[in-house]
Amino acid sequence: MERVWEAYGLTEEEYRKILKTLKREPNHVELGVLGALWSEHCSYKSSKKHLKKFPTKAEWVVQGPGENAGVVKIDEKVWVAFKVESHNHPSYIEPFHGAATGVGGIIRDVLSMGARPIALADSLRFGEFNYHETKRLVKGVVSGISFYGNCIGVPTVAGETVFEPSYKTNPLVNAFCLGVIPAGRMYRARATREGQLLFLIGSSTGRDGIFGAVMASGEFSEDVEEKRPNVQIGDPYFGKKLVEAIMEIVEKDLIVGMQDLGAAGLAGSASEIAAKSEKGVELYLENVPLREKDMNPYEILLSESQERMLLVVEEENVEKVKEIANKWHLEGAVVGKITDDDTFRAYYKGELVAELPVSLIVDEAPVYDRPYKEPEYMKEVRNFNQEELPQTDVKEALKKLLSSPNISCKEWVYTQYDYQVGTNTLLIPGHDAAVLRLKWVLRPELTTEKGIAISSEGNGRMVYLNPYEGGKFVVAEVCRNLACVGAKPLAITDCLNFGNPERPEIMWQFVKAVEGMAEACEELGIPVVSGNVSLYNETVEKNEIRNVFPTPIVVGVGVLEKAEKYTPSKVEKESELYLVGNLEENLRLDGSEYLKVIHGLIKGDVPPVDLEKEKILINLLISFNNKELITCAHDVSVGGLLIALLEMVFRTPYGLEVEVYTDERPDVFFFSENPTRVIIGVESDKAEEVKNAVEKAGLEWMYIGKTTEEKKIKVTFNGDTLLEDELEEYEKLWRTSLEKLLGST
């Protein structure tokens, strides 16, 4: 038998399943549809079994996983929809366009729920700067994100950028979007009866992005030139017009449901609507507005051209929808209808070019229970004893850490984004979480005094060292960040970036990370309402397989009772500084930036998260914010305590005086990244009340210093002065190091 299935990304076993169901050989177009919809990117065939472990329900959850975005209640007037998604493979091939279309795609996911997009965030991973392509990739990706986000008028308010060798030839570009919905006005990818029409609105259809879903479900080789046509090209100006047109259509209640056109194009969107509606669908491909000549049915069905949406419309509303499309200078045409059988049919100029059971395309996509086993490297990385590390000079170590691209200021990145467009951003990038007000310009009666907070986190290094504990570590940090600004965590969305699931060692990383994340979500009472899985993040380079660190990215959304009542991460007034949280756990350097930068090691085990104490700390921080008992709060994370303290005073008028007494080694105390620890600023007249509240909650506190009016830093450790300098030289290192690495200064 000719191995025809391989060209469509199918396995022989999958092809035999298709033959058995159809009782005939599928044609070229049908194979294209099945190859795209059965790809890992669309079907989640390796991960679906394990994703069921996540908690997804809560009284404030309106829509959990299974739709284009999750939806949660903010109050009786406002809901929010949000999701994070990857665009990793396209961003390596074409950094600018890959990243830009990643932003466009996630905006349309949220838009398809009937939500107006109001905020973006991104989580980026690149190789280190000794790799010649890193500068090009960073500049291209950041330019692509800023181009699309700035032009479409949605602020990029949060994110993170990390550099590790494992991402050298496989960068990770994860984009998040959040939108607001009037309560009760949510849409789904659904039809309600046969005879309803499918209306394609937006840009015209070209050949860009064909095979995009299949490409995103395979490993890379060094030669990516041949894959460039698989990368979609986005147009944010067209995207902006599409947003406004959809908002007008929704406001006038002219549609039944909608679905954006993303992976697998029209074939994917139409079959998903049919499957979720338990109906069939007919498509008339000659009606699709085209931008290129001589496109064949295969190309029309599977094109992933951007800025397109598929609307379910009653026949009597078609002309009204067309008028709105014309008003916004968008293409618009009826391209199909809903039928009462379980069949996907595509016609081209009267000829039937594809006929498949909807259930086969969507519901019967294979689900694999892949084998998994602990990788051999685990024995090597666990062989670590921090007591054997040589003592280092704290001052020199601090300077090296401030120069690390993982710690140095990311202003070069986020100042390219317009994070204030829309004038709703109250707490800008550089804090533990962004804070936004929920303001409706056109519908002031829907404005609420509540605010939302957004935080994005990932720690591939920790997950690599212990996927189970690392999964807990990441979820806990996101929730802690939200609480630091005073927000109650409501829900998370995740993007699970892993290597090839056909390798048992990679599948073990995935399974254990999901289990750890699920446990943290259960214990902290945080549902997972949406997400994305990105597998096959590996590169074959000179016959050597290079896998990325297992990298679950978690974006959390929280609510503040009053938008303007938040806690900043920066010092805004003179304060005493206290470390609060779980201070009884032995401090460890395992997996820390200090261990990597100063000692060249990625070793150890993940410092465990005490989820019970984490939950107490989260509630305590929210209480402190509501009672206005603290002046600032910042969690101890990458770089450790001393880095966190400096981050709180950099870009402020204040200096820092650190004074600690402990039995720990100086390097362990200052650079450990143990979780469940937060630095808070307290005015002296409120210190006793705060300390009493910490003790009453069952947590620990430690006085670690104070801010000063003089812009200096002084660190004393058990009575010995370790450093005493002008703060400016440390701040300059932190502020300029990344720009210098990028050749921008």
UniProtKB/Swiss-Prot annotation:
Which Pfam family is one of those matched by this entry?
AIRS_C
Which keywords appear in this protein's UniProt record, sorted alphabetically? Answer: ATP-binding, Cytoplasm, Ligase, Magnesium, Metal-binding, Nucleotide-binding, Purine biosynthesis
What do the Gene Ontology cellular component annotations say? cytoplasm
Pathway(s) per entry: Purine metabolism; IMP biosynthesis via de novo pathway; 5-amino-1-(5-phospho-D-ribosyl)imidazole from N(2)-formyl-N(1)-(5-phospho-D-ribosyl)glycinamide: step 1/2
Q: What class of enzyme is it?
A: ligase
What NCBIfam families does its record include? FGAM_synth_II, PRK01213.1
**How the protein assembles, per its UniProt entry?**
Monomer. Part of the FGAM synthase complex composed of 1 PurL, 1 PurQ and 2 PurS subunits.
Q: What is this protein called?
A: Phosphoribosylformylglycinamidine synthase subunit PurL
Starting at the broadest rank, the lineage of the source organism is: Bacteria, Pseudomonadati, Aquificota, Aquificia, Aquificales
